[in-house]
């Protein structure tokens, strides 16, 4: 009865350990982040080796139990009195049952190992694919980082050019303001020159009118002077003729 309890406890421990292995394998096969994908193959192999060691220890302990039972049964057979030989069949039956239980436990263990191997064989391609995708994403990330650096350099260059353009614009604004100021002064001077020109034109017109009046006055004086000269010439001629006649009349 004690042996059956030991076998039941061993089988229960084996089932619990197998469930733990399956749970750990399922936890390992769950989706992980990008930073953990590269560690999945090593992690899975590590878990598999650790679980394999656990199963080996469990199998060793079970073999020790079986060895102990076989040794105990052999000692019991050798130490039995002739009166106890009647229960030999019952002991053999117990041993047979124990061996059958051991075979069942071993078969269950091997089934669980096969399940784990199958799960690992299915998970490894997924891990490789995840690792490949991680590598591609890493390359894409590096390319994006390179493009980001190029864009940042272009942005800095554009900012510098914008600052230079702003300075040039400020200089052009100052130059434009100076040109407008000078143009305004030139226009003011031009307006003053126009006004002076109009004044000079008016003065020239007035002077021309004075000159015309003076010319008319001079022409009038000249004509009057000519008339006086002619009149004086005629008078002198008359005087000369009169004197000549007087002289003739006085001569004998």
Swiss-Prot record:
Keyword Translocase part of the UniProt annotation: no
Highest taxon of the lineage: Eukaryota
Keyword Electron transport applies: no
One GO term of the biological process aspect: homologous chromosome orientation in meiotic metaphase I
One Pfam entry name: Zwint
Coiled coil regions, renumbered to chain: 120-221
Principal place of residence: nucleus
Cellular localization per UniProt: Nucleus; Chromosome, Centromere, Kinetochore
InterPro entries: Zwint-1
Start-end of Basic and acidic residues biased regions: 89-99
Keywords assigned: Cell cycle, Cell division, Centromere, Chromosome, Coiled coil, Kinetochore, Mitosis, Nucleus, Phosphoprotein
Gene Ontology cellular component annotations, sorted alphabetically: dendrite; kinetochore; Knl1/Spc105 complex; nucleus
Region Disordered, annotated ranges: 80-99
Residues with PTM Phosphoserine: 216, 249
Subunit relationships: Component of the KNL1 complex composed of KNL1 and ZWINT. Part of the ten-subunit outer kinetochore KMN network that includes the KNL1, MIS12 and NDC80 complexes; a bioriented kinetochore contains approximately 150 copies of the network. Interacts with the MIS12 complex subunits MIS12 DSN1, and PMF1. Interacts with the NDC80 complex subunit NDC80 during mitosis. Interacts with ZW10. Interacts with CETN3.
Function of the protein: Acts as a component of the outer kinetochore KNL1 complex that serves as a docking point for spindle assembly checkpoint components and mediates microtubule-kinetochore interactions. Kinetochores, consisting of a centromere-associated inner segment and a microtubule-contacting outer segment, play a crucial role in chromosome segregation by mediating the physical connection between centromeric DNA and spindle microtubules.
Protein name per the record: Outer kinetochore KNL1 complex subunit ZWINT
Organism the protein comes from: Mus musculus (Mouse)
Gene from which the chain derives: Zwint
């Amino acid at each position: 009865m004690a042996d059956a309890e030991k076998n039941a406890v061993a089988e229960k421990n084996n089932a619990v350990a197998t469930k733990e292995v399956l749970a750990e394998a399922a936890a390992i096969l769950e989706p992980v982040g990008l930073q953990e994908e590269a560690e999945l193959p090593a992690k899975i192999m590590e878990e598999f080796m650790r679980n394999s060691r656990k199963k080996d220890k469990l199998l060793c302990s079970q073999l020790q139990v079986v060895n102990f039972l076989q040794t105990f049964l052999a000692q019991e057979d050798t130490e039995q009195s002739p009166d106890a030989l009647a229960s030999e069949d019952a002991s053999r039956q117990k041993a047979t049952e124990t061996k059958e239980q051991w075979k069942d436990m071993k078969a269950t263990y091997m089934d669980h190992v096969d399940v784990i191997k199958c799960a690992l064989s299915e998970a490894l391609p997924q891990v490789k694919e995840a690792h490949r995708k991680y590598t591609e994403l890493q390359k894409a990330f590096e390319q994006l980082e390179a493009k980001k650096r190029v864009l940042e350099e272009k942005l800095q260059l554009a900012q510098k050019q914008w600052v230079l353009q702003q300075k040039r614009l400020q200089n052009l604004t100052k130059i434009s303001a100076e040109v407008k100021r000078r143009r305004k002064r030139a226009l003011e001077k031009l307006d003053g020159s126009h006004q002076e020109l109009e004044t000079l034109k008016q003065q020239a017109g007035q002077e021309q009118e004075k000159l015309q009046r003076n010319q008319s006055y001079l022409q009038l004086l000249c004509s009057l002077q000519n008339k006086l000269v002619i009149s004086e010439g005629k008078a002198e001629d008359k005087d000369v003729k009169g004197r000549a006649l007087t002289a003739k009349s006085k001569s004998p």
